[in-house]
Amino acid sequence: MQKMESDESMHIIDIREDYEVQTGMLKGAEHIPMQTIPDHMHTFRQNEPYYIICAHGVRSEKVTGYLRDHDFEAYNVTGGMAAF
């Protein structure tokens, strides 16, 4: 979480469903629903960190693992949006 609080440019991917993001998103986050991540793999770049967020951190943990399995640098935002 410390890195997320810095001013560094970063890729935050909000994987919540459409109805969930209607309540708000983190500034600068990109919305890619969890089920569509495989369809968006071509948009991810190697050697760049991605911070994956969902409502509570459970779904984002799964997506983080999926991205890591495909050799991407990915981090789960523990606690998800509920932590904010």
Report the location of each language-model feature.
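Short, surface-exposed ligand- or partner-binding patches at beta-edge/loop junctions that are enriched
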Residues: 53
